[in-house]
Design a protein with these regions (language model features):
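Conserved catalytic cores and adjacent C-terminal regulatory segments
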Residues: 1-186
Length: 186
């Protein structure tokens, strides 16, 4: 994976030639991690030490990069596990939307079904690995389940009103756990 770092002490190797973020801007790094093909075009990046590369969505780790963050904190940076506090924010779980006939046809394509399942399984697997591999790292995950029919959507949702409803649900999720989160970090 391509992991953009801005601190040389977080690098595992090649520290003598380290360039923060590979010389990319923050917007380029974000675009590279969101280039979910086949839905979006791959992102071309000019890495200062490596030349031009084609970056694609980091679906396997970008959905929940917890293991990378904790690995960096423990290893190159050297923070003891008992001093690490990890808060991870998921997108939540929603009912499947009713689809129009053409989306039903697309959804039946094995590659699309595999992609949707892979993205869901990836984030959940990372969560399980965190608990099993790093039991001494204190960790809270916020990723609530919503069953209400008006929240039925998938990762292709583009209606801004519905997406704003998701933002509000995210705020509600935080509000419900705000005291727990504040206590966790004190």
């Amino acid at each position: 994976p391509l992991i953009f770092k801005n601190r040389v002490d977080a690098a595992y190797g090649m520290k003598a030639t380290f360039i923060p973020g590979f010389g990319c801007t923050v917007s380029e790094a974000v675009r590279a991690s969101c280039s979910a093909t086949p839905f979006f075009k791959a992102c071309m990046l000019d890495l200062k030490n490596d030349g031009t590369i084609e970056a694609r969505d980091g679906g396997f780790c970008a959905n929940n990069p917890s293991l990378f963050a904790v690995s960096d904190a423990l290893n190159p940076i050297g923070i003891p596990p008992e001093n690490i506090r990890l808060l991870t924010l998921g997108v939540g779980h929603y009912p499947e939307p009713k689809k129009k006939w053409y989306w039903k046809a697309v959804g039946r394509l094995p590659s699309v079904r595999i992609l949707q399942r892979t993205l869901n399984v990836s984030a959940n697997t990372t969560e399980i690995q965190m608990k099993l591999l790093l039991p001494h790292v204190q960790h809270i995950r916020v990723s609530d389940r919503f069953d209400s029919p008006e929240l039925a959507m998938d990762f292709l949702e583009s209606n801004l009103n519905r997406l704003n409803l998701l933002v509000q649900k995210g705020r509600d999720s935080f509000s419900a756990r705000e005291t727990e989160i504040k206590t966790f970090f004190n």
